[in-house]
Amino acid sequence: MGWLINPSFFFICTNLIYFSKYQLHSGVSSLRPNSFFKNDDMFRYNSKERRNFKLLKNYNKYVEDHHCIPKQFKNHTLIKILNFDINNSKNIYIMPNKKGKSILNLHPDTLVHQGYHYKYNMFVKEHLDYILLKPEYDEKKYEFWLFFNHLKDNLQFNNNIPWK
């Protein structure tokens, strides 16, 4: 009954139910070297399947794909060390745009994705740089995993991340 209280709950659950059939949410193990193979990720950024899903749900005019770790950091040293695929579907969060927030009747505090988000990107860069300073590979991997999940957990209502 959560969707009656908070309409955005339904929007998010729809995405989670559909994507969770195809994605493994395995925490630290998902950051193993070579774990993000391009050929076995049906819903990676700009894939045909991802576009078709949004068309099927009639979301295509109302949402944008947000990279949790922004594309501009695909060559960051930490991202390279961890062999993290920026375009993997685990790094993409479907977010409503301004029109979508209204049309989909989402909660007023729901974040919208409309173009660039400088403060968010600088926040991510600062943390990537900090994690890179950790001496051990496993420590870097673990800290990155914690940070990555923190970002994903806070993208709906902007509880603890800067935006715009």
In which residue ranges do the predicted regions lie?
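Short hydrophobic alpha-helical membrane-entry/anchor segments
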Residues: S20-K21
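Betabetaalpha-Me/HNH-type nuclease active-site subdomain
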Residues: L24-T110
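C-terminal, well-folded lobe of enzymatic/effector domains
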Residues: H107-K164
